[in-house]
């Protein structure tokens, strides 16, 4: 399922709102919603493509154990990287230690362009990814610390010179 949300901040079970929420959401025209995924706070809003793949995941090594979450996240990242490459983004990739898709991940100034937050229950995926297309980045830069990552910037396709 693909969608574009109205202004909303969502946060998962490991969120540190005292540190990473820097505004009163109502005062900036956004909702604040707790969701049943891991991770910290993120923003969804106009100009952002959000995808919620609903899939049955295979168990690790083909057995009857838990789903291979790491392989799933890796495949979602690769899907986004391949799509960005087709759109003309030449420097998208993975940034070691941080999920999602990044621009110039091997530079001293990597920028996150796509957040990924998933959960698996009974072998089925929930939640997904959020790709910043023409997003108002003010919501991420001034109102929250996106995904609890203060040391690195966020960006959008539009800011990277890609107008789709």
Residue ranges and their predicted role:
Residues 1-110:
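N-terminal lobe of the biotin/lipoate ligase/transferase fold
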């Amino acid at each position: 399922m693909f969608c574009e949300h109205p202004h909303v901040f969502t946060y998962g079970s490991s969120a540190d709102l005292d540190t990473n929420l820097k505004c009163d959401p109502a005062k900036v025209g956004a909702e604040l919603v707790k969701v049943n995924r891991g991770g910290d706070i993120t923003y969804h809003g106009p100009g952002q493509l959000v995808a919620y793949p609903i899939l049955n995941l295979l168990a690790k090594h083909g057995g009857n154990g838990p789903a291979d979450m790491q392989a799933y996240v890796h495949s979602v990242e690769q899907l986004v990287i391949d799509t960005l490459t087709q759109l003309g983004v030449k420097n998208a990739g993975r940034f070691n230690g941080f999920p999602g898709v990044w621009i110039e991940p091997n530079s001293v100034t990597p920028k996150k362009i796509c957040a990924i937050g998933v959960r698996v229950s009974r072998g089925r995926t929930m939640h997904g990814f959020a790709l910043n297309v023409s997003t108002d980045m003010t919501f991420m830069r001034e109102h929250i610390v996106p995904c609890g990552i203060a040391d690195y910037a966020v960006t959008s396709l539009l800011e990277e010179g890609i107008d789709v």
